[in-house]
Amino acid sequence: MRLVTLAPAKVNLVLRVGPVRADGYHDLRTLMVPLDLGDRVDVRVSARPGPVRCTVPGRPELDGPENLAARAAEAFRRRFGVDRAVSIRIEKRTPVTAGLGGGSSDAAAVLRCLARALRVRDGAALAALALEIGSDVPFFLGPGPAWAAGRGERLSRAEVPPLDLVLVYPADPSLAIRAGDAYRWLDEARASGSQAPRRLGRPGRWRPTLLGNDLQAPCVARKPALQALLGLLVGAGATAAIMSGSGPTVFGIFPGRGAARGAALAIQGRAKGGAAGVQVLLARTVRRHPRVSPWRSPRSASSRSTRRSSRPT
C-alpha cells in the first residue's frame, strides 16, 4: 500500500517554560498551530518483510536511519510487531532545525500512514509512541491547533482563527540554535536574575495579547541578528512578531493575505539588498491536520480531471 500526506509545519503562538524537572525536561504551556506549509510525505508499505528506507531528494544528509521519520517507522514496527518493508520519501519544504517542527511532523505523518495502512486503531498506544519519539510529535497526531502541557503530551483543543503569517528563517549557520541550548540559556538567565520565571497559567481562549515566547529573550541575547529580523517584520507591517519554538525562525502576524504577501516581497527585496541568507515563507494557520490519502500517479490524476471537465454542466 502507498499513502501520501502533508506534514505541516507549526508555529508556537505561546510558549511558556516552567522550571527544569527531575528528568531533565521542562514543564511547558504552549499553544501550537499547524500551517498550510509543510513537507510531502510518501510512505510505501510492502506485503513482504524488509527494512525501513528513508530518502529526501536533494538533501542526502537527511537520508537514512537517523532521520526522525525512519526512527518513527522502526518504533512503530517494534511496538506493533510488524516486519513489513517500509519505504519513506520526503519532499522537504519546511526548513530544518528551524523551530517549525518539521522533523516531528514528518515522524507523525509516518505514524499516521502506517496506522492506516496496517489498520492500527489504538490511539493511546500511538500517542505514547509519539512521545517516545519526540516532545512535539503528539501534537502532529492531534486534531489541529492545541494547547500542550507537560512535555507536550497533554493536549487540549484550541480555537484559533485563520492567521496570515510571514516566516523568516535565517539560513546562516552561525544563527542556528539547538533546542537544548535555548532551554539552557533560559535556565542560565533565570539563575542570574536577568529573566524572572513566569507562571505557566492555564489554557484559555486565544487572543493576541497572549502572544509570547519565553525562549526568545535569551536566544536574542546570544544571536542579536534575530532582533533585526523581528524588526524587518514589524517594519513591513506585522501587527506582532516573535520567534517560533526554540528558533531561529521568526514570524509576523499580518491583517490579511494581501498584506502578508506584500510584506514577504518587501522582506525578500531587503534580503537581496543586504540581509542575505534568509528564507522568507508565506503561510496561513489551519484548523486541522491534513488527511492521509492513497497515492495516485500524476497520469491518473490528470485523467480524472479530464473526465470531470468533459461532463456536461
Swiss-Prot record:
This protein's name: 4-diphosphocytidyl-2-C-methyl-D-erythritol kinase
Pathway(s) annotated for this protein in UniProt: Isoprenoid biosynthesis; isopentenyl diphosphate biosynthesis via DXP pathway; isopentenyl diphosphate from 1-deoxy-D-xylulose 5-phosphate: step 3/6
UniProt similarity note: Belongs to the GHMP kinase family. IspE subfamily.
Catalytic residues, chain numbering: 10, 136
EC class of the enzyme, as a word: transferase
InterPro entries, per database record: GHMP_kinase_C_dom (IPR013750), GHMP_kinase_C_sf (IPR036554), GHMP_kinase_N_dom (IPR006204), IspE (IPR004424), Ribosomal_Su5_D2-typ_SF (IPR020568), Ribsml_uS5_D2-typ_fold_subgr (IPR014721)
Listed Low complexity bias regions: 292-304
Residues reported in the UniProt entry to bind ATP: 95-105
One Pfam family linked to the record: GHMP_kinases_N
Any GO BP annotation: terpenoid biosynthetic process
Biological function: Catalyzes the phosphorylation of the position 2 hydroxy group of 4-diphosphocytidyl-2C-methyl-D-erythritol.
A GO molecular-function annotation: 4-(cytidine 5'-diphospho)-2-C-methyl-D-erythritol kinase activity
NCBIfam families with a match to the protein in the record: ispE
Keyword Kinase annotated: yes
EC number: 2.7.1.148
SUPFAM superfamilies referenced in this protein's UniProt entry, alphabetically: GHMP Kinase, C-terminal domain, Ribosomal protein S5 domain 2-like
Keywords for this protein: ATP-binding, Isoprene biosynthesis, Kinase, Nucleotide-binding, Transferase
